[in-house]
Amino acid sequence: MAEGQVLVLDGRGHLLGRLAAIVAKQVLLGRKVVVVRCEGINISGNFYRNKLNYLAFLRKRMNTNPSRGPYDFRAPSRIFWRTVRGMLPHKTKRGQAALDRLKVFDGIPPPYDKKKRMVVPAALKVVRLKPTRKFAYLGRLAHEVGWKYQAVTATLEEKRKEKAKIHYRKKKQLMRLRKQAEKNVEKKIDKYTEVLKTHGLLV
């Protein structure tokens, strides 16, 4: 699949289950999906209850030989990946191929920091959850059950945002200069513009 057809989603502010369901459907249909900022994904319900549920889930193991599984993930990106896996027939070739089309990241690593990121309105917390309802952050939950890189991810995100601000300022300045340059030569190129319009080359 072409690079332009990769769907880059920003996980921040989305509900875990709803986003996972939409992503699962897209990868089954053959689209390549990349989900960034998984630490900003939300889970409905208060934090304490979600933490108890996840800790209960972590306690499940094979009594005779725990090394045989189940294997539990602590990073937000891997928790999201496993949620999507549960919505796919991952033990079949079709399901495995679909799972291979999904990439998940904590923070926004290169080259995705330079690409346009999309949101899914059907999975956004502000759209789907009443303002009075409680919710938890996947990043905080992951941190409290053993994820060690919350501070590192936060630091890298701050650096990325600073770089993005500088880039945006430069872009605005260039756009302003371009508009000014176009305005300066507008009268000089009027006759050429009219000729191009008559030939249908300029609208």
Swiss-Prot record:
Molecular function via GO: mRNA binding; structural constituent of ribosome
Location of this chain's protein in the cell: Cytoplasm
Taxonomy, superkingdom: Eukaryota
Keyword DNA repair set for record: no
Classification via SUPFAM superfamilies: Ribosomal protein L13
Positions of post-translational N6-acetyllysine modification: K191
PTM notes: Phosphorylation at Ser-77 upon interferon-gamma treatment in macrophages involves a DAPK1-DAPK3 kinase cascade and is causing release from the ribosome, association with the GAIT complex and subsequent involvement in transcript-selective translation inhibition. Citrullinated by PADI4.
Keywords on record: Acetylation, Citrullination, Cytoplasm, Phosphoprotein, Ribonucleoprotein, Ribosomal protein, Translation regulation
GO cellular component: cytosolic large ribosomal subunit; GAIT complex; ribosome
PTM annotation (Citrulline): residues: R59, R140
Family as reported in the entry's similarity comment: Belongs to the universal ribosomal protein uL13 family.
Protein task: Associated with ribosomes but is not required for canonical ribosome function and has extra-ribosomal functions. Component of the GAIT (gamma interferon-activated inhibitor of translation) complex which mediates interferon-gamma-induced transcript-selective translation inhibition in inflammation processes. Upon interferon-gamma activation and subsequent phosphorylation dissociates from the ribosome and assembles into the GAIT complex which binds to stem loop-containing GAIT elements in the 3'-UTR of diverse inflammatory mRNAs (such as ceruplasmin) and suppresses their translation.
Protein name per the record: Large ribosomal subunit protein uL13
Organism of origin: Canis lupus familiaris (Dog)
Lineage: Eukaryota, Metazoa, Chordata, Craniata, Vertebrata
Gene coding for it: RPL13A
